[in-house]
Amino acid sequence: MITPITLAALLQRFFTLMQQRQASPHTISSYRDSFRQFLKFVQQRLRKPPSRLTFEEIDAPLIVAFLDDLEKHQGASVRSRNLRLTAIHSFFRFAAFEAPSHSAQIQRVLAIPSKRFTRTLVQFLTRPEVDALLAAPDQLTWSGRRDHAFLLVAVQTGLRLSEMTGLKREDLIVGAGAHLRVVGKGRKERCTPLAQSTLAVLKAWLREPQRGDDDVLFPSAKGERLSVHGVQYLLTKHRMAACKVCPSLKEKRVTVHRLRHTMAMDLLQAGVDRSVIALWLGHESVDTTQIYLEATLAMKERALAKTLPPNGRPGRYQPGDQLLGFLNSL
């Protein structure tokens, strides 16, 4: 009699292999969250704890039911649905080598297609909305000063959420050519220059008593790295406060990615070339040599000089369809 393959054993080997192959922490956490969500659904559907599930029970109809539940009952977007399916497909490609006797089951799962979706126009904040958001935190409190610095850096640099929460104090380089050193997707290192106003706020923030031992630039109240939920909480909190002086924010959801788009639009409005914007946002390969990093930093500093600081007066610019398509691809 063939002993059934447990799902737990396969999943553990799958994530161990990801770590051994040095997959990015972002990919690992995304796949982890996908399977957490999936296993909660399976537990409710099959009424079995995840540790007792066999691989054979995870078939295509069950996965399709999970994907449908994401959209119909959990309010997930098509992109989120496809992201969860990507994680499941990756696991089943691994299982094809670990459990070849289940090849028919595996092929049926791998045949589940991603959904097509209509790309919407890029959403970003206007200058008055940005100014209202930056003014919202109460800077008489520790958390307010942290949030103000966090928002200012996000707006001025266009860093990704994982890049913002992963910043260390040592990543802030002050003095001549002040910049943030960032390791983005694919472990590509890049340098993002800082405006003088942003640098002044960060210098003041560094003088605050450090919380925790992890040297995180923007820690939680417990001194730990901010969670995704924690970041969205502070963004929503300050958006609601900013609505009092800028009512248009009531109709917008503020996320770190939307602030990233806002920075990209600021650069476009300043006439910065799209190739430089892509380089700024980490969408171009960055050589790890110091010479290339310094050259990249100088190019970005010239781009930064063309933008306006918060409270500045923007110019008028109407991007063409190709530019909007470029922004949508970020």
Task: Describe each region flagged by the PLM.
Residues 1-330:
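Conserved catalytic core of the tyrosine transesterase superfamily
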